[in-house]
Amino acid sequence: MMEELRQTLDLQLSQLNTIAGILRAEQQLLCAGSIDINKLHEITEQKNFVLTALGHTDQKRQILSKQVGIDRPYQGQPFLADLWGQLVDLTEELKHLNQHNGLLLEQHITRNSETLHFLQKNHSPTLYGADGQAQRSILAGRKIQI
């Protein structure tokens, strides 16, 4: 059972490394001048899939740890403790990478919102109200006032 726990920790490490690759690909995409929304959606789906698998693997690790009678950081088992240390270090790295990607995404959203606001403000048709004054309409189509 100790070997199965080691294999589970190895699998978690592999899954975290996969997530690292996905986050780096996401970062490259977010650093590009314009975002390929289809590619971003694909990356998000990949990330969600691996995170779900990681959640299942962690549940298995917790069950095995209880069955063996040891828990993280596995100080009584040097090899397991080393694997756990690698997992903790990689998780911290992924946390920072994910936060950075979140900031990049937020910048894109802000820029797109500002652009949309500018376009709506400056490129909407001008209509005249009953008082003869110009009114801007941000709605598409015709506006009729009676």
Swiss-Prot record:
SUPFAM superfamilies: FlgN-like. GO terms for biological process: bacterial-type flagellum assembly. GO terms for cellular component: cytoplasm. Keywords: Bacterial flagellum biogenesis, Cytoplasm. InterPro entries: FlgN-like, FlgN-like_sf. It is found in: Cytoplasm. It comes from the Bacteria. Required for the efficient initiation of filament assembly. Belongs to the FlgN family. This is Flagella synthesis protein FlgN.
